[in-house]
Amino acid sequence: MWKRYLSYLSFPLAVFLFHCVLTLVFDAYDRIEQLDTGMHFLGGIAIAHFISHTIIQLDRSKILSARSPITFFLLVFGLVAASTVMWEFAEFITDYLFDMNIQVSVTNLMKDQFLGIVGGLVYVASFRPDRQI
């Protein structure tokens, strides 16, 4: 089970590592204005991927019952939304503690959260849990 679980984590980790390389090595977010938009959308997809497969594993293990498509959708949607909020909190704390300028405005903050949630919605709308459970 853990091997399968780690395989579900590989996509989100790859997205995060890609983000780190773009930020720390290439300073790409300052050079390519639209990169932030695409990465938040991709981050929402990655989070939804991990959450979806985690819910399926919890269902198979009889820890959580998510056989209803509505229950599955609401769980994934709610957890993706919570994850985007937590990510933005982390950015705020980084800005505050290290005097960085990651969150340039409230508009940017809301756009980032919106794009993460939309990415999650796109993933969950195309995902078929009935084929997995």
Across the structure, where does each feature detected by a protein language model lie?
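"…centered on the first transmembrane helix and the immediately adjacent amphipathic helix/loop
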Residues: 1-53
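Residue-level signature of transmembrane alpha-helical entry/exit and packing/kink sites
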Residues: 8, 37, 68-76, 108, ...
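Small-polar-interrupted transmembrane alpha-helices in polytopic inner-membrane proteins
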Residues: 10-23, 72-94
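Hydrophobic faces of alpha-helical transmembrane segments in multi-pass integral membrane proteins
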Residues: 14, 43, 47, 51, ...
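Interfacial helix-loop-helix junctions of multi-pass membrane proteins
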Residues: 26-36, 84-117, 121
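Membrane-interfacial alpha-helical segments at the cytosolic side of multi-pass membrane proteins
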Residues: 42-60, 96-101, 117-130
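Internal alpha-helical transmembrane segments of multi-pass membrane proteins
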Residues: 57-81
